[in-house]
Amino acid sequence: IDTETLGLNPYRDRLCLVQLSRGDGKAELVQLRRHYEAPELKRLLADQSVLKIFHFARFDMAVLKHSLGVMPWPVYCTKIASRLARTFTDRHGLKDLAKELLGIELSKQQQSSDWGADQLTQEQLNYAASDVLYLHALKEKLEAMLVREDRQGLAQACFAFLPTRVELDLKGWSDLDPFAH
């Protein structure tokens, strides 16, 4: 799952697009108009039997919770998994992971574009789809690395904390590290 918004502030910048993939090489794009309820999307996000894979889940979960009132669960975050499994690098962006783990070049050219437009361009649609098409394959690679380094339990604990981290973010404590001295 990925989201596209008008900016990076969930309170100011509306959710415009949600991208989904089952890992079958296809992507479903849900364009959200203002005040759209998205009942089927909400049902899927809340479905406990479906693992939701994100890259930087913290942001997408906050946007989805704020915009649709649903906290996605259960979740897997490829960015967190990468940080725990790939401690030899500081390159944990989706573009870097796709290149280094899958040999796939992702274009980020449309990342900052008008996602609120009534009609999205083919370039925007291609970009949006590419952001979810490889998440399942990345999860598999990262999961193998986490197992190899005996860090899968730590990753699961981080994923379990994400809803709390998101609630802290949404309540105004985005820079709070509750564990800091």
Question: Language model features by range: what are they?
Answer:
Residues I1-H181:
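DEDD superfamily 3′-5′ metal-dependent exonuclease/proofreading module
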